[in-house]
Amino acid sequence: MNPNQKIITIGSICMAIGIISLILQIGNIISIWVSHSIQTGSQNHTGICNQRIITYENSTWVNQTYVNISNTNVVAGKDTTSMTLAGNSSLCPIRGWAIYSKDNSIRIGSKGDVFVIREPFISCSHLECRTFFLTQGALLNDKHSNGTVKDRSPYRALMSCPIGEAPCPYNSRFESVAWSASACHDGMGWLTIGISGPDDGAVAVLKYNGIITETIKSWRKQILRTQESECVCVNGSCFTIMTDGPSDGPASYRIFKIEKGKITKSIELDAPNSHYEECSCYPDTGTVMCVCRDNWHGSNRPWVSFNQNLDYQIGYICSGVFGDNPRPKDGKGSCDPVNVDGADGIKGFSYRYGNGVWIGRTKSNSSRKGFEMIWDPNGWTDTDSNFLVKQDVVAMTDWSGYSGSFVQHPELTGLDCMRPCFWVELIRGRPREKTTIWTSGSSISFCGVNSDTVNWSWPDGAELPFTIDK
């Protein structure tokens, strides 16, 4: 074979290889296109069945090592359309309280990145329930946790995370700079209220879906403060109560009506012999009921009920089963303030059922320990101390703290009534546990059910002190 023939032969072979390679590439492209078409058709079929594939990601940080666990669940389609929460249902009939959530945040925080918090509370939309809390701008077991017993500082912020999860930087959403706060959902968006600033000039910042819509300046210049639990939304309007003035004497109390973050009406309560702080509010048949803290002179709890026009009634829970802390032994109640051990107090709640009342309270009369729910069938109007049901949820030997109400609307539960629920803060650290340099808390929550429940204790359970405390 002469040189020219060799060149022609080699060229022919190379061309043949090139053609074969081109054919293979075309085949590969066709294969990918067919595969994509099959997948697209499968997804369209899923859509026809009204199902969604939702990926939930739980992220855990241990010793700065990031572990991502992804679980894919096929979930029957849930309507995420915005809707106005009516709030006109009555409370569901209940026989007791079922455990709903427990975040164990102090236990987890001994080794993980968990916020130092206080004043946690829960609020639900028509799609989800979230835990809201006031951070101290610090993590547990870190040097910045020192001195976090202080209530008001520029480092505090309202944040939220999915209910039942320990609040950490990786699952939490910033809501507002605040050392006093409230939040609620009207079916279309979250309203948040965050109060921050100096004691003699604090400002409440209202946000709707994360955008500032309104501000309220302290009108008495004596520590403007709000509920530390959820506000209430009825037919597109949301309602909250704020206090400004002394914590040990008559103060000023205002109810605000808010629509999409804008104040549409407000009134001041005419209640010279009452004291309203840190109110726990809920909707019931289109009206709003708030049960509050009397830090001035009552060991029973004051209440205020109002309609959407802000026409209101006020009073005190009459039962001889007293709900505040400190408080005297149960005995003769009053529909006015019970002055015995009436000074100071703690945030709490009750649910009214006609003349009856479910009273949530610490088990201890004098310290923030234990927690129990008591059903007094005539306690809203009668002054005796007889009750029918007592359910223990935190033992007398374990720390508790603030407590408050929240509800689950029929739009969330599918029930034809408003499900009553409550949360309990489990405070750890200072000022009671002096082996620590910090103050923080975890939380538990319960919801009312018309079925069997149990007496038990669900304490915080963290072993103190932490490494930073030694």
Swiss-Prot record:
Residues 1-6 are intravirion. Ca(2+) binds at residues 294, 298, 324. It catalyses: Hydrolysis of alpha-(2->3)-, alpha-(2->6)-, alpha-(2->8)- glycosidic linkages of terminal sialic acid residues in oligosaccharides, glycoproteins, glycolipids, colominic acid and synthetic substrates. Disulfide bonds join 92-417, 124-129, 184-231, 233-238, 279-292, 281-290, 318-335, 421-447. Residues 36-90 are annotated as: Hypervariable stalk region. N-glycosylated. Inhibited by the neuraminidase inhibitors zanamivir (Relenza) and oseltamivir (Tamiflu). These drugs interfere with the release of progeny virus from infected cells and are effective against all influenza strains. Resistance to neuraminidase inhibitors is quite rare. It is a single-pass type II membrane protein. GO terms for biological process: carbohydrate metabolic process; viral budding from plasma membrane. InterPro entries: Glyco_hydro_34, Sialidase_Influenza_A/B, Sialidase_sf. Glycans are attached at residues 44, 58, 63, 68, 88, 146, 235, 365, 455. Its main location: virion. Catalyzes the removal of terminal sialic acid residues from viral and cellular glycoconjugates. Cleaves off the terminal sialic acids on the glycosylated HA during virus budding to facilitate virus release. Additionally helps virus spread through the circulation by further removing sialic acids from the cell surface. These cleavages prevent self-aggregation and ensure the efficient spread of the progeny virus from cell to cell. Otherwise, infection would be limited to one round of replication. Homotetramer. The influenza A genome consist of 8 RNA segments. Genetic variation of hemagglutinin and/or neuraminidase genes results in the emergence of new influenza strains. The mechanism of variation can be the result of point mutations or the result of genetic reassortment between segments of two different strains. Intact N-terminus is essential for virion morphogenesis. Possesses two apical sorting signals, one in the ectodomain, which is likely to be a glycan, and the other in the transmembrane domain. The transmembrane domain also plays a role in lipid raft association. Belongs to the glycosyl hydrolase 34 family. This is Neuraminidase.
